[in-house]
């Protein structure tokens, strides 16, 4: 079945793309969540127009993300955490924690854009990649330090 994506769908495409998908996938997943509509002549013309507008918006957003990436790339941040015996943390440092540190420093980012390779459970310095947009991935350094009591 040919569908026009209404929103970006991971592993399928961006909003406005025309895609061929299995009938069941369209009826049971894409249509109920309003992620896509059936492709017919009228919808295709409207989608083509929307895609043009979307590309302009995407280009503006990409330029804005490049500016944010320039400001973020290479920056170093400290986080104070409680530890058990030695250098082991109580719990772990998560993308939510990193997002809150970045927010305090003027960068409001979605936690899903922050990539931590493996859970941070020890003190030390860690490189963290942030996926702002396709091809724009600044790397920050996070210094995990013991909270003084």
Curated annotation (Swiss-Prot):
InterPro entries referenced in this protein's UniProt entry, alphabetically: Ribosomal_bL9, Ribosomal_bL9/RNase_H1_N, Ribosomal_bL9_bac/chp, Ribosomal_bL9_C, Ribosomal_bL9_C_sf, Ribosomal_bL9_N, Ribosomal_bL9_N_sf
GO biological process terms on file: translation
Pfam families reported for this sequence: Ribosomal_L9_C, Ribosomal_L9_N
Leader sequence segment: none
GO MF: rRNA binding; structural constituent of ribosome
Keywords: Ribonucleoprotein, Ribosomal protein, RNA-binding, rRNA-binding
One Gene Ontology cellular component: ribonucleoprotein complex
Domain of life: Bacteria
SUPFAM superfamilies assigned: L9 N-domain-like, Ribosomal protein L9 C-domain
Coiled coil: none
PROSITE patterns noted in UniProt: RIBOSOMAL_L9 (PS00651)
Family named by the database record: Belongs to the bacterial ribosomal protein bL9 family.
Function: Binds to the 23S rRNA.
Protein name: Large ribosomal subunit protein bL9
Organism: Leptospira borgpetersenii serovar Hardjo-bovis (strain JB197)
Taxonomic placement: Bacteria, Pseudomonadati, Spirochaetota, Spirochaetia, Leptospirales
């Amino acid at each position: 079945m040919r569908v026009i994506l209404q929103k970006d769908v991971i592993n399928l495409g961006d909003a406005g793309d025309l895609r061929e998908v299995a009938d069941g996938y369209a009826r049971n997943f894409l249509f109920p969540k309003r992620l896509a509509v059936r492709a017919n002549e009228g919808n295709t013309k409207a989608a083509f127009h929307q895609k043009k507008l979307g590309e302009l918006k995407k280009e503006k957003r990409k330029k804005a993300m490049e500016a944010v990436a320039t400001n973020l790339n290479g920056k170093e941040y400290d986080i104070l955490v409680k530890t058990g015996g030695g250098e082991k943390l109580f719990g772990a440092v998560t993308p939510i924690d990193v997002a809150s540190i970045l927010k305090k420093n003027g960068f409001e980012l979605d936690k899903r854009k922050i990539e931590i390779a493996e859970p941070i459970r020890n003190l030390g310095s860690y490189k963290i990649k942030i996926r702002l947009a396709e091809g724009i991935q600044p790397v920050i350094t996070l210094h995990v330090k013991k909270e003084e009591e």
